[in-house]
Amino acid sequence: MKVLVTGAGGMVGSHMVELLYDRGDDVIGIWHKNKKNIEQIAKPIKFTQCDLRYGYGIDDIIMENMPEQIYHLAAQSYPTVSWVSPAETIDVNINGQVAVYEAIKKARKYKDSSYDPMVVVACSSAEYGQTLNELDDPYVLETAELKPLHPYGVSKVGQDLLAFQYFMNDHIRCIRARIFNSTGTRKVNDVTSDFTKRAVEAEKTGVYELRCGNLETRRAIMDQRDLVHALMLLADKGKAGDVYNISSEHIYQMEDIVKMIEKAIGHELKRNIDPALIRPTDERIIVGNVEKLKADTGWKQEISMEQTISDMLEYWRNH
């Protein structure tokens, strides 16, 4: 099968192209700004640089390859950046997606009117926003109201609804995947990534201290391999036009993460609480109800947090 992955330079995208290649697919990966993750891939996967906002680039890629599945992962994906650069966030996330869909329409018009790819759009738990603070049950359903609290969340609502309207009006099959917290190798700037990287630095220096924030915070975190597996299952088995949560069902306190790291490295870490790492207010536990995902695809979370941490430690030892 010919498959296109946008955002192939990101954590999820770079792992996805490898897993699709291992499955036997003919994979094309699109990257834009950062090649670091792609340079770590030894497999003979085709990569091309493209800024999706300029439609002629993605037009040519889709017209030439006519992929049967498209995983649209490319995005400005940091909420904090969206506060500083709201216009760019909206531009990249909304207009980039419009360009992908318009390229599909052009391929139908000029090359094959029966062209019928499945488009899996990476949406976000950030779409729920304030609703997460109002619900009694932390396990949020796909039917919950969308009340985003930052420009990034707004842009993801836009992507979500754009996919739906192209499905309804142009009959372009899609899956809208609302993705919750994930981590893994090649991830940067999240708690698990920061802690494992600092632990490896402690191994190298012999100073077993860990700079950290509020260790009582709790998060539902899944391994990026479980996330990629869910996305691949949805492309094959999900109901076209529908929306699905992808979330860990396991909740971890940050102190538990530190203890897992200590066990993995065989050494205790002195906790150095840095006030700069403590948020003035912290969000509630964010967990997605994944019963719909499991019912329609058979997905289940398979990779333990202990395994994720072990793999991340090994990654930082070698990079």
Residue ranges and their predicted role:
Residues V84, D91-E102, D112-M118, S125-R176, ...:
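Catalytic helix-loop patch of NAD(P)-dependent Rossmann-fold dehydrogenases
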Residues A42-Y54:
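Rossmann-fold cofactor-recognition segment
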Residues L210-N214, G241-Y244, Q253-K259, G266-I285, ...:
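C-terminal "lid/loop" region of Rossmann-like NAD(P)-dependent oxidoreductases
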Residues D25-K35:
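Conserved glycine-rich Rossmann-like NAD(P)H-binding loop of the short-chain dehydrogenase/reductase
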Residues L52-V92:
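NAD(P)H-binding glycine-rich loop region in Rossmannoid oxidoreductase-like domains
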Residues V3-D22:
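N-terminal Rossmann NAD(P)H-binding glycine-rich loop of SDR-like oxidoreductase domains
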Residues M305-H319:
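Amphipathic terminal alpha-helices
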Residues T131-P138, L161-A220, Q224-L233, I251, ...:
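NAD(P)-dependent short-chain dehydrogenase/reductase
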